[in-house]
Amino acid sequence: MARIAGVNIPTAKRVPIALTYIHGIGDFVAGQICDAVGIDRARRVNELSDAEVLSIREYIDANVTVEGDLRRETSMNIKRLMDLGCYRGLRHRRGLPVRGQRTHTNARTRKGPAKAIAGKKK
């Protein structure tokens, strides 16, 4: 297994698919990386030489925010919104949907499991 950005990527898969195992790299960015480094998208990871893996690793380190740095940046952005006290920050703090979705029904993913209310019947 090749190790890129602290992640063991699968060797049997094609390079763009294997790169998506890294947090912060999706299909589009994986294709961009292959094009920038000059690796054919149809090649598999086990066919790459050490120099090619190194060039992918260097490109990702220089140009893409991934893994821990990306997670830290995202959490700091949410924390900043919460500290500002803006509407989005309040929604994050209360554990409610942030982007205007309805909450009268649904929103169970964000709100958690339904809580029983004593004395309420249908």
Curated annotation (Swiss-Prot):
<dbReference type="GO" id="GO:0006412">
    <property type="term" value="P:translation"/>
</dbReference>
<comment type="similarity">
    <text>Belongs to the universal ribosomal protein uS13 family.</text>
</comment>
<dbReference type="InterPro" id="IPR001892">
    <property type="entry name" value="Ribosomal_uS13"/>
</dbReference>
<keyword id="KW-0694">RNA-binding</keyword>
<dbReference type="InterPro" id="IPR019980">
    <property type="entry name" value="Ribosomal_uS13_bac-type"/>
</dbReference>
<feature type="region of interest" description="Disordered">
    <location>
        <begin position="99"/>
        <end position="122"/>
    </location>
</feature>
<dbReference type="InterPro" id="IPR010979">
    <property type="entry name" value="Ribosomal_uS13-like_H2TH"/>
</dbReference>
<keyword id="KW-0687">Ribonucleoprotein</keyword>
<dbReference type="GO" id="GO:0005829">
    <property type="term" value="C:cytosol"/>
</dbReference>
<keyword id="KW-0820">tRNA-binding</keyword>
<comment type="subunit">
    <text>Part of the 30S ribosomal subunit. Forms a loose heterodimer with protein S19. Forms two bridges to the 50S subunit in the 70S ribosome.</text>
</comment>
<comment type="function">
    <text>Located at the top of the head of the 30S subunit, it contacts several helices of the 16S rRNA. In the 70S ribosome it contacts the 23S rRNA (bridge B1a) and protein L5 of the 50S subunit (bridge B1b), connecting the 2 subunits; these bridges are implicated in subunit movement. Contacts the tRNAs in the A and P-sites.</text>
</comment>
<keyword id="KW-0699">rRNA-binding</keyword>
<dbReference type="InterPro" id="IPR027437">
    <property type="entry name" value="Rbsml_uS13_C"/>
</dbReference>
<dbReference type="InterPro" id="IPR018269">
    <property type="entry name" value="Ribosomal_uS13_CS"/>
</dbReference>
<keyword id="KW-0689">Ribosomal protein</keyword>
<protein>
    <recommendedName>
        <fullName>Small ribosomal subunit protein uS13</fullName>
    </recommendedName>
</protein>
<dbReference type="GO" id="GO:0019843">
    <property type="term" value="F:rRNA binding"/>
</dbReference>
<dbReference type="GO" id="GO:0003735">
    <property type="term" value="F:structural constituent of ribosome"/>
</dbReference>
<dbReference type="GO" id="GO:0000049">
    <property type="term" value="F:tRNA binding"/>
</dbReference>
<dbReference type="GO" id="GO:0015935">
    <property type="term" value="C:small ribosomal subunit"/>
</dbReference>
<dbReference type="Pfam" id="PF00416">
    <property type="entry name" value="Ribosomal_S13"/>
</dbReference>
